[in-house]
Swiss-Prot record:
Residues 20-31 have a biased composition (Gly residues). PANTHER family: TRANSMEMBRANE PROTEIN 214. Glycans are attached at N269, N307. It is a multi-pass membrane protein. The chain crosses the membrane at residues 480-500, 616-636. This is Transmembrane protein 214. Belongs to the TMEM214 family. It comes from Homo sapiens. The modification N-acetylalanine is found at A2. Coiled coil: none annotated.
Amino acid sequence: MATKTAGVGRWEVVKKGRRPGVGAGAGGRGGGRNRRALGEANGVWKYDLTPAIQTTSTLYERGFENIMKRQNKEQVPPPAVEPKKPGNKKQPKKVATPPNQNQKQGRFRSLEEALKALDVADLQKELDKSQSVFSGNPSIWLKDLASYLNYKLQAPLSEPTLSQHTHDYPYSLVSRELRGIIRGLLAKAAGSLELFFDHCLFTMLQELDKTPGESLHGYRICIQAILQDKPKIATANLGKFLELLRSHQSRPAKCLTIMWALGQAGFANLTEGLKVWLGIMLPVLGIKSLSPFAITYLDRLLLMHPNLTKGFGMIGPKDFFPLLDFAYMPNNSLTPSLQEQLCQLYPRLKVLAFGAKPDSTLHTYFPSFLSRATPSCPPEMKKELLSSLTECLTVDPLSASVWRQLYPKHLSQSSLLLEHLLSSWEQIPKKVQKSLQETIQSLKLTNQELLRKGSSNNQDVVTCDMACKGLLQQVQGPRLPWTRLLLLLLVFAVGFLCHDLRSHSSFQASLTGRLLRSSGFLPASQQACAKLYSYSLQGYSWLGETLPLWGSHLLTVVRPSLQLAWAHTNATVSFLSAHCASHLAWFGDSLTSLSQRLQIQLPDSVNQLLRYLRELPLLFHQNVLLPLWHLLLEALAWAQEHCHEACRGEVTWDCMKTQLSEAVHWTWLCLQDITVAFLDWALALISQQ
């Protein structure tokens, strides 16, 4: 409202609720003051027309709680109305009045009771409402889900890592129906899961600042549901979470909450779990409040994934050797119990570090192993280092060349390694011994050069030189060729016996016969031979009497059955030979599908073995079974034809005796030919030596 003043002749701005003293000087100072006041008032409207919008609010926060407040409006006293300030037209910000105790969700005695009391139908109804109102903003749907669950699941607070429960707690308590709702909503909002994971984690950290804060079971359930299907969300930006962890290093509860949330990715995937452990937990290993959870998590992770092939390639030398120092170096920042626990995990970490092809990677670990193997290192660590160095030299051929390059600058460490090789030389494979011989000779030449130059580490050079000489003696030492010696002894005995019998023209007059007679062995052997001969004659006469009768009777009784069995056998063999190829093809296809399933879980060597096994039945059928079967059929046909021709259709003892005599004679001739050929070969071998 404005009025025209007669004395001044100018317009004056009239404001309601004018401060004292403002209107007193208005007429004397002219219109400039009025224009400045108008400009100030307009300026307020120009730059702050509405209060700031809370971007993190969700439908649940702005809708569900307001509905509850309106329903309980008669129980809440109305807020006091503040008088408007006359000089400011800015709208006052609404101060959210905290709900009283009657409005808050009551705490249950346990999380199980809270989940049983949760109305799944009401949750689905609220989520449907959220999706209909915010149809194009799936992040709000997810935030509504987390807020609803966390609001309804108010149970007693637990420690941040939930170490007293299973790895999938609290998600393991969720019913199948509720899991379906959660996973269905996560599938609809797949593009917002990474932001939702960050929202849950940061909201949990904010709740930890409140005293007392709400229990965080709803957010934990959402995090576990996300990472169970998409564990890579936690490892997509580990650097960000490491900075977050370091910024809260003075708050162990927040750090453990971050580690717990990221660690849920490992229970679904070993690779992602190792990424989390190496990127988040290894950097804080040694901090008193965080180390127990880090080692416990690693133990649980490796226990849940016994097949370590999925984790090959994740641990490199930069990550492995700090773990070695933590496990074996005394007086470090770990407690003795944690260090002992890490020592028990070390063999599996070593398998992960060496990977699927240690024969091509161990030489990269050799320098760090060698530099740590000092004479002053602890005994347990020295034992592990020397064992690992020996494994490097045994498995990876390139480790020997790396050792030759490092040798002049690591004489004390090399002396320990050489002495260890000397003491365990018999356990090293023969092929590796031959390859190490060249390396040891090279080291011996290096020792001689260092001794001529007068090296400062003269004592270490002398120790290394003595160990090299001992190893070379082990390599080049004389060993009896036992196989050749036994063969030579056998040939000499046979040759002496033949010469003795030939020179004395009889066994009784030979030196061998006299020695056997004087020792008493010859009479005993003659008596045994006589008894054996008499028993053989009795058996021969009994067979001559009974075999023709029993043979004729048996042939009369069994011939129809044999003919029928022979016909069935031929039919069966024909059927199998006709259908065997299809079955083998089916078996090969089955092995192919099985190998494809196991290809991800098994190393390359096992896959190659499976491929060979898949081809083995077909090769065995084609190259062994079929030729043997045809050979057997031909042999049976030839034997049947030969017996029919020899015996003229009648089975008599004389005919069988003749055939057996011919077979024995033919066998004896073959053995004589084989023996003569063996003696000729042995004599030729001896003459070449």
